[in-house]
Amino acid sequence: MASLKDLRMKIVSVKSTRKITSAMKMVAASKLRRAQTAAEAARPFAERMERMLGTLAASLAGQSGAPRMISGTGFDKVHLLVAVTADRGLCGGFNSSIVRATKAMAADLLKQGKTIKIMPVGRKAREQLRRDYGQYMIEGFENLGRKGIVFAEADQVASQISAMFDAEEFDVCTVVYNKFKSAIAQEVTRQQVIPFPVPEQAAKSETGPKAIYEFEPSEEEILAEILPRNLATQMFRALLESQASEQGARMTAMDNATRNAGDMINALAIKYNRSRQAQITKELIEIISGAEAL
């Protein structure tokens, strides 16, 4: 049985931990507001750009003059998986959900006889995926968004992906990230970015009369210029969504940890009081027994 001194030390230790988790919760809540605003602001632009490009690309799909980012390499052999996680932990299942999804995709592709490459974006992706898929890992990115995600960082990731595609190092690229739903809910999203997925009903995606486009210069030249920018835009969106999801998950995890610490303190306090009461009772019995012996 723990002594009163041990119980007091445990209570002090848990109270100290509660202060830390409470502070981390408040910091995450503050960062969440900024990250959520940024993610929600970027989402409509990225979605609109996808729809517009889908409409434009639909007319070129299958044609010999279509940009490679639409037509692809003509093969489906090598897949690049871009796993977006955080650099730090203490955010519940945020990182593990991406790692599980990436592992599931990797295992499925390998089972189909495909070749895979994994680009980790975030320290946790690198640390956790290299245990089972270290031989497939390539150079990735860490320490992004220390003061908030900026477009230049997303463009850096997109540029490396584009360079690899131009060098024919892969055929298909899929980004795996957490889409922000709320502070307590994130959705694992798998988004194919290369080749650009042309919706079957792209021309019918907009309500109302269909837009008529005039191209200057040619449609192919415009798409060849816009598609790499769209890749950077989609990466920017993925990083913003991931950052908002991370802060929401961390705030929720620290809130739960703070509550659990409070429950533990109450339980230890009850145990301490009972032990102290038992010790006092024992001492009283010893005094009374000694007095009776006299």
UniProtKB/Swiss-Prot annotation:
Q: What are the annotated disulfide bridges?
A: none
**InterPro entries noted in UniProt:** ATP_synth_F1_ATPase_gsu, ATP_synth_F1_gsu, ATP_synth_F1_gsu_CS
Its domain of life?
Answer: Bacteria
**PROSITE patterns, sorted:** ATPASE_GAMMA (PS00153)
Q: Name one GO molecular function term.
A: ATP binding
Query: Which Gene3D superfamilies does the record cross-reference, listed alphabetically?
Result: 3.40.1380.10, ATP synthase, gamma subunit, helix hairpin domain
What Gene Ontology cellular-component terms does the record carry?
plasma membrane; proton-transporting ATP synthase complex
Any one Gene Ontology BP term: proton motive force-driven plasma membrane ATP synthesis
Q: What does this protein do?
A: Produces ATP from ADP in the presence of a proton gradient across the membrane. The gamma chain is believed to be important in regulating ATPase activity and the flow of protons through the CF(0) complex.
Subunit structure as annotated in this protein's UniProt entry = F-type ATPases have 2 components, CF(1) - the catalytic core - and CF(0) - the membrane proton channel. CF(1) has five subunits: alpha(3), beta(3), gamma(1), delta(1), epsilon(1). CF(0) has three main subunits: a, b and c.
Protein's name in the database: ATP synthase gamma chain
Question: What species does this protein belong to?
Answer: Paramagnetospirillum magneticum (strain ATCC 700264 / AMB-1)
Native organism taxonomy: Bacteria, Pseudomonadati, Pseudomonadota, Alphaproteobacteria, Rhodospirillales
Q: Which gene encodes it?
A: atpG
